[in-house]
Amino acid sequence: MYKKLEALNKIQHKNKSVAEVSNFLYSKELMNAPVALSEFFEACKNYPIFFAKDKDEKWFATVLLGYKQGENLFVDKKGVWKELHYIPAFVRSYPFILVNQEDKKEMVIAIEGEYLDEKESSKKLFNEDGENSEFLNSAITFLNQFYADSLGTADFIKQLESWELLEEKIVNIVNTKEEKFSFNGFFIINEEKLKHLSKKKKDDIC
């Protein structure tokens, strides 16, 4: 989804603005998207939610948007997201994203370079006094909230794991064209074990 990320810099980007993101074509090749616990209620109405681990062995939740790499079945050729379907916060945060610094001690805000310009019609990143614009502060708030929610989601999944509620699942799907797809490395909640979970633990989940 991101092709030319630039870490936000007050000096380098002091005169830069951000062009309007008018459609979702940027996500047309997004096969799956991370979601936070706060999104589960809406997201599960439209997409299957799975749990997985990243390269650092950290848990995250994700929704499946396509059957193969480079495919998002919910975005049409004009970049319109399928009507009445929830759009994940990760997708809505574009063209901004939080990324790890090299030392991994702090997260920094980065932006898709293709959307940077100096046009009057675009939204300024910084005011004339060099302070963050209202537009940028709004984006930062959104990113920080999603990041905090993602950390909480990882803790939630770790709790499920400690109660032995997770099971690895190989997902086999046949689409309308009779094409077969198989996915592994995903985990789901074992419903039978969940039924026998103590009331206290169920309350803790909720």
How should each PLM-predicted stretch be described?
Residues 25-28, 69-79, 149-155:
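Short, basic/low-complexity N-terminal boundary segments at the transition from targeting/disordered tails
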Residues 44, 86-89, 151, 189:
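Short, well-structured alpha-helical interface segments that form or flank functional binding sites
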Residues 48, 95-97, 193:
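Short, surface-exposed charged micro-motifs
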